UniProtKB/Swiss-Prot annotation:
Induction: Expressed during the late times of infection. It comes from Human cytomegalovirus (strain AD169) (HHV-5). This is Protein UL88. Interacts with UL48. Plays a role in incorporating a subset of tegument proteins into the virion. Belongs to the herpesviridae U59/UL88 family. One of its GO terms (cellular component) is host cell cytoplasm. The gene is UL88.
Length: 429
């Protein structure tokens, strides 16, 4: 048992050492082993193996639930027992698993998340979870549930918010499903093969992503490495495909109602992070929130807009799609500067001239009050300085450029901490 636990720790990067519980539709046990579902079917295996190489413990014609989870989303390290399959992207997978010839979306539920498990510790940048007082345990089902879900056109869309149908879809009779126990080194092989670690400092070779000085990059790197869930070429391809369709107005008819709802939500955004149209800004922010495991519109937009995996090359993903990475980086840089204004707010007394007074009903002021809600002791001059920073940023789209032009760099050190909670708050603004 101790050897298995040691192997589990070694299979993960130091900042990713897992806690027991659900990871990508597979259940990590206290002894370091992984329990999950295995699907045996020749056509299904052939479909998945076109994209994912077999792990060292895979038998012929077998794929694992964690592989299907990644294949459908391109995301890693999701604290979830559930994953979605969209017809728009994966009609061939829907047919292989169920024999269904058309639907909008299937949800596969591999088990039950223990009621004592809380998703995030408030203010924790690493996204680690903690347990409550309830003794409810995570449970792996003997056979996964599979449900046909109506496409959501508003509100929260994550599996925690859907109303489950009274009856589930039937698995195809030639798909044999069993539960298996695996070594985590084998289960983790998929991540080690596909993950980019794009936000590591040594990968900082893309000029358009160098948005901060090296010392700020180093301060943000741990957050960006640990909080994101989509750091893979496959996820980049999905985002690129959906963004290309959105930009070219090449929208599938089945997605028209969803898109109409998103246009309204995009119009309500107060803060634009990139110099692109408002709907594209909203899409990129939702993709970032989806990476951060926030149940909003990101999954639904990607699922209903993205084409088949092989369509990514047409959309330009093969050349490296970076806009969602840039959006996440810009949000993190702005969070660092806003938090630094609060951390060193006493120094703002020396600003000459002082920032203009902020009107109480100013929409950006409302955003800032929500952003600073958990900081405590936020002074009026801090809100005014932050308002001026965001107003200048709206013209330049350069966080540090605005910070310097307003003279804040002479008074305030950009050395505050940034948490996942701050990122989420700014991306929602």
């Amino acid at each position: 048992m101790m050897e298995a636990a040691a192997a589990a720790a070694a299979a993960f990067r130091p900042e990713e050492r897992p806690t027991p519980g659900w990871h990508d539709a597979a259940l990590l046990m206290d002894d370091g082993t992984v329990r999950e579902h295995a699907f045996r079917n020749g056509p299904l295996s052939q479909l998945i193996r076109r994209v994912l190489p077999p792990p060292p413990d895979a038998e012929d014609d077998v794929v694992f639930a964690s592989e299907l989870c990644f294949y459908c989303s391109g995301r890693f390290n999701r604290r979830s027992s559930v994953f979605s399959i969209y017809w728009q992207k994966h009609s061939d997978l829907v047919y292989a698993l169920t024999g269904i010839t058309h639907c909008a979306k299937l949800v596969v539920e591999c088990g039950q998340l223990g009621s004592s498990r809380l998703r995030w510790r408030d203010g924790d940048a690493s996204g680690e979870e903690r347990r409550g007082d309830d003794d409810s345990r995570d449970e792996l089902y003997d056979v996964p549930g599979i449900y046909m879900i109506r496409v959501n056109d508003g509100g929260s869309t994550g599996p925690r918010h859907v109303i489950w149908p009274g009856t589930s879809v039937l698995w195809a009779p030639d798909v044999v499903i069993t539960t298996v126990q695996r070594r985590i080194s084998a289960a983790r092989a998929l991540v080690n093969t596909f993950r980019q670690y794009f936000f590591l400092l040594e990968r900082r070779s893309h000029e358009e992503l160098v948005l901060c000085p090296p010392e700020m990059e180093e301060r943000l790197a741990p957050l960006l490495q640990s909080a994101t869930r989509g750091d893979s070429d496959m996820f980049d391809g999905v985002v690129a495909s959906a963004y290309h369709r959105l930009r070219m107005s090449n929208i599938p008819r089945s997605s028209a109602r969803l898109l109409e709802h998103c246009v309204g939500l995009a119009g309500a955004k107060k803060l634009l992070l990139l110099d692109v149209p408002r709907l594209e800004n909203y899409f990129l922010c939702q993709v970032c929130l989806y990476e951060l495991d926030e149940d909003e519109m990101g999954e639904e937009m990607l699922g209903m807009l993205a084409g088949k995996p092989e369509d990514a090359a047409v959309s330009g993903a093969s050349g490296g799609f970076l806009l969602h990475r840039k959006t996440m980086k810009l949000a993190a840089c702005l969070c660092l500067l806003l938090n630094s204004l609060h951390l060193h707010q006493e120094a703002l007394e020396a600003l000459d001239p002082p920032p203009p007074r902020v009107e109480e009903n100013d929409l950006v002021n409302v955003v800032l009050r929500r952003y600073y809600r958990s900081h405590g002791g936020v002074q009026a001059r801090t809100l005014a300085a932050a308002r001026a920073l965001l107003a200048d940023y709206a013209e330049t789209f350069s966080p540090l450029g605005s910070f310097t032009r307003l003279g804040y760099d002479r008074l305030v050190s950009a050395d505050a901490g940034v948490s996942r909670r701050h990122l989420v708050a700014l991306l929602r603004a």
